């Protein structure tokens, strides 16, 4: 079935999207930072170092400062199995407190989780930086400033702008 302009309607009555923008994926560290309120806290602790959002955007050391901040505040992303490990360690530690093999096994696993979390920052750096910039933009310029930062890199918004710039695409 098709609508009058020729758009295909799939089973269930939904219209197929003309354009599909790939999902950016999940960001466990960025989400943990957001849930903890750390973006806001970082801005509150550091806003006196900058006179405007332009100074923030020009600071090449900003992400290094933010990484130190989240490490000092013990903010980490969720790694699959992390909670299960914590529960298992609590249960086994009580029973097998002096078992060197179990303690070493937990130590190895915990080091792997720490390694995974440190790579999370690098993997998610772009989205974390966007969030830090957005929070500073909100501090200096309110919601308009925040959305100007967030939307300039948003893939869906960028695709829409691209389509609207080409009249032949959005009128077809």
Where are these regions (language model features)?
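Conserved functional hotspot residues or short segments at active or partner-binding sites
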Residues: 1-172
């Amino acid at each position: 079935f098709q609508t009058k302009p020729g758009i295909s309607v799939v089973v269930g009555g939904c219209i197929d999207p003309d354009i599909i923008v790939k999902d950016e994926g999940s960001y466990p560290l960025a989400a943990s930072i957001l849930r903890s309120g750390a973006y806001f806290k970082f801005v509150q602790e550091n806003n006196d170092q900058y006179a405007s959002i332009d100074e923030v955007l020009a600071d090449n050391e900003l992400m290094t400062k933010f990484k130190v901040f989240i490490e000092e505040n013990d903010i980490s992303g969720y790694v699959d199995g992390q909670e299960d490990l914590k529960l298992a360690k609590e249960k086994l530690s009580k029973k097998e407190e002096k078992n060197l093999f179990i303690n070493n096994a937990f130590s190895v696993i915990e080091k792997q989780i720490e390694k995974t979390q440190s790579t999370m920052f690098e993997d998610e750096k772009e989205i974390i930086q966007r969030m830090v910039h957005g929070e500073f933009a909100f501090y200096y310029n309110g919601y308009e400033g925040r959305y100007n930062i967030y939307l300039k890199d948003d893939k869906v918004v960028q695709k829409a702008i691209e389509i609207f710039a080409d009249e032949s695409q959005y009128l077809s």
